[in-house]
Amino acid sequence: MQKTTFVKNEAALANKKWYVIDASNLILGKLAVEAANILRGKNKVDFTPNVDCGDYLIIINSDKIVLSSDKADREKWYTHSGYIGGLKEKSGRLMIEKYSDKLIYGAIKGMLPKNTLSRYLIKKLFIYKDANHKQAAQKPMEIKLN
């Protein structure tokens, strides 16, 4: 009878890879799903839910992301300062133009599990607004998404 194998922390640390995704003309939700799976390690054969077996991920050209359908005009993002009358509202178009990195970060973070492990997973995510990134020394492999 074949037994289930689990990955140890030491083995998971040895198998970390670096990936880069170009976010140009990609839909936000589809990008976030793929990114969360890579960060979590679900694309690997030896996935273990309680071990950080995911890889590092770099997302470039975040300002060229696309929201599906008419969400750029219809959806609103809200922040509150904590003071009376401190509610601020931002449209999807403004979020893409000015805060595209925070938009992608929030979408990916929302798709990770809500536990202690997710704090370690989200630290392996690097988002840049243009094509230049600081992790060239790690020789990241490029992933093409449709």
Curated annotation (Swiss-Prot):
HAMAP family recorded: Ribosomal_uL13
PANTHER family in alphabetical order: LARGE RIBOSOMAL SUBUNIT PROTEIN UL13M (PTHR11545:SF2), RIBOSOMAL PROTEIN L13 (PTHR11545)
Keywords: Ribonucleoprotein, Ribosomal protein
Homology family: Belongs to the universal ribosomal protein uL13 family.
Its job: This protein is one of the early assembly proteins of the 50S ribosomal subunit, although it is not seen to bind rRNA by itself. It is important during the early stages of 50S assembly.
Residue intervals passing through the bilayer: none
Any one of the GO BP annotations: translation
Domain of life of the source: Bacteria
Record-given protein name: Large ribosomal subunit protein uL13
Gene expressing this chain: rplM
Gene Ontology MF, one: mRNA binding
